[in-house]
């Protein structure tokens, strides 16, 4: 990756400077929040390693690192529902990425839903936490897409 090391930079350089200095965690990952570029809705939260971040910058498609599979993946490589990146941002200390995307096919979640955030935390009559579906319509059948 062509970015400079965050450890070699003064805090002001990281927070106010114009050089990309992503701060990856001990596992070499950085959190990525992905939102719909039009609505602003959060579609998913995933992780990127240095290679995924660079591929995203270079290609304009969203690339992530799967912790469970321990591998790099391009969003949509199995489903065809590619995320086209319209804007990328880093937070103040460059340890989180925010990408605004155009979501191909309308669904970002592997469950077939538009967003991975399709359940709201409410309380039942006893006050216990309860998950309530919101925007939970499936746009595709995962069993047919991920064979």
UniProtKB/Swiss-Prot annotation:
The keyword Glycosyltransferase is assigned to this record: no
Catalytic activity, as annotated: 1-(5-phospho-beta-D-ribosyl)-5'-AMP + H2O = 1-(5-phospho-beta-D-ribosyl)-5-[(5-phospho-beta-D-ribosylamino)methylideneamino]imidazole-4-carboxamide
Top-level taxon in the UniProt lineage: Bacteria
The entry's keywords: Amino-acid biosynthesis, Cytoplasm, Histidine biosynthesis, Hydrolase, Magnesium, Metal-binding, Zinc
Pathway: Amino-acid biosynthesis; L-histidine biosynthesis; L-histidine from 5-phospho-alpha-D-ribose 1-diphosphate: step 3/9
Disulphide-bonded residues: none
Gene Ontology CC annotations of this record: cytoplasm
Biological process annotations from GO: L-histidine biosynthetic process
DNA damage in keyword set: no
Enzymatic class: hydrolase
Sequence positions that bind Mg(2+): 91, 93, 95
Main localisation: cytoplasm
Binding site for Zn(2+): 92, 109, 116
Subcellular localization, as worded in the UniProt entry: Cytoplasm
Cofactors (names): Mg(2+); Zn(2+)
Entry's Gene Ontology molecular function annotations: magnesium ion binding; phosphoribosyl-AMP cyclohydrolase activity; zinc ion binding
Catalytic activity, EC: 3.5.4.19
Cofactor note: Binds 1 Mg(2+) ion per subunit. Binds 1 zinc ion per subunit.
A Pfam family this chain is assigned to: PRA-CH
Similarity annotation: Belongs to the PRA-CH family.
Alphabetized NCBIfam families for the sequence: PRK00051.1
Assembly information from the UniProt record: Homodimer.
Function recorded in the entry: Catalyzes the hydrolysis of the adenine ring of phosphoribosyl-AMP.
Protein name: Phosphoribosyl-AMP cyclohydrolase
């Amino acid at each position: 990756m062509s970015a400079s090391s965050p450890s070699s930079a003064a805090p002001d350089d990281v927070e106010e400077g114009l050089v990309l200095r992503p701060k990856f965690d001990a596992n070499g990952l950085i959190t990525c929040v992905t939102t719909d570029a039009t609505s602003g809705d959060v579609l998913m939260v995933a992780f990127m390693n240095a290679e995924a971040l660079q591929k995203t910058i270079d290609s304009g498609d969203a690339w992530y690192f799967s912790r469970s599979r321990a591998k790099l993946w391009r969003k949509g490589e199995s489903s065809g529902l590619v995320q086209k990146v319209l804007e990328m941002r880093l937070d103040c200390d460059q340890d989180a990425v925010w990408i605004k995307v155009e979501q191909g096919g309308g669904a970002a979640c592997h469950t077939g839903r538009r967003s991975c955030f399709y359940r709201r935390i409410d309380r039942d009559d006893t006050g216990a936490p309860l998950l309530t579906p919101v925007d939970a319509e499936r746009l595709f059948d995962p069993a047919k897409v991920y064979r």
